[in-house]
Amino acid sequence: MGRKALAAALAVAIAVIVPGIANADTGAWVIQGSDHARALDESQGLATVIRPNGSFIQYTGISTIPIADSAKGWNHVGDPGSRLGYYVEPYQSDNNGAKMFRVQAPNGAWSEYTHKLESWEALNNSFAAVSPDGQWLVSGEWGTMDRLLVYPMPGVRFTTPNQNLPYAFAIRPDHPINDIQGCDFTSSTQLLCSSDDSDGTLYGVTKPLLQLDLSGPLNGADVTAHVSALGQLPLQSSCTGTFEVEGMDYDMRDGTLRVVVMSPGFCVLTDSKTWRFKHS
């Protein structure tokens, strides 16, 4: 949830410039390289959209929120997700008492689905991850949590945008997870997640790449998940300060994992990166 931190960095635009080092040890996920991540329109996350007429990578950022949605109070967009040609952007609001998912169908048509918050539910809507069968939508809240939320996939399993998108069930990790910025399925029973955890007490490492092995495919009832920390994501910049790990994407076509990491201070503009990994 980097909107305030990013806005402050853009306003101040001052930092101490020093050489940076990429300290990443993410187990079998080996760095293949990186691409510049623009601060305004590539700072929240990304999704690989695969369609018969062509495939593309779609990013989200603070400048990609449609004006009409911003006017309705949807003031933050998270890490998007995609599967079977459907593309989903997650939105949150400080005042609407709801979350919104903006969905583009394979034919290019857009719809908006609103979920009214449950009494126990946080307002955060950090990411959207679609199950491999296209039937379920997974999202996450901010802070330390013992759940990921699952909804019927809007546009596929739930097709009435004018009705409340219902909460369906949860993924229940066997270990608390903190500040999850993005998740994506690598199979029907495995998620990879990017965590912006700056404390490090949960897994002994800050800013980790997490692996969640599910007890079974999503099928309409709670599933448990074994959580493993695979190591710290790369933190490389010419500036000192606090990095922000953002969203992620797994491209099932070639096994490429991409994770956005925004740089500290002024360098948020100059050397933020989308890191590319492959499993060795």
Question: Residue spans of the language-model regions?
Answer:
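Signature of short aromatic-glycine-proline-rich micro-motifs recurring in repeat-based ectodomains
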Residues: 40-45, 74-80, 125, 177-183, ...
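Structural motif
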Residues: 55-56, 66, 95-103, 144-153, ...
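Secretory targeting and sorting signals
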Residues: 1-24
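Conserved blade-ending motifs and adjacent loop-strand segments that build the rim/top face
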Residues: 221-252
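Loop/turn-rich, solvent-exposed surfaces of beta-rich toroidal or solenoidal domains
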Residues: 175-227
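Beta-strand-rich domains and repeat architectures in extracellular enzymes and scaffolds
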Residues: 32-62, 71-81
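Surface loop/turn motifs at the tips and blade-to-blade linkers of beta-strand repeat domains
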Residues: 34-41, 68-73, 115-122, 170-176, ...
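Blade-loop segments of beta-propeller domains
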Residues: 62-99, 110-119
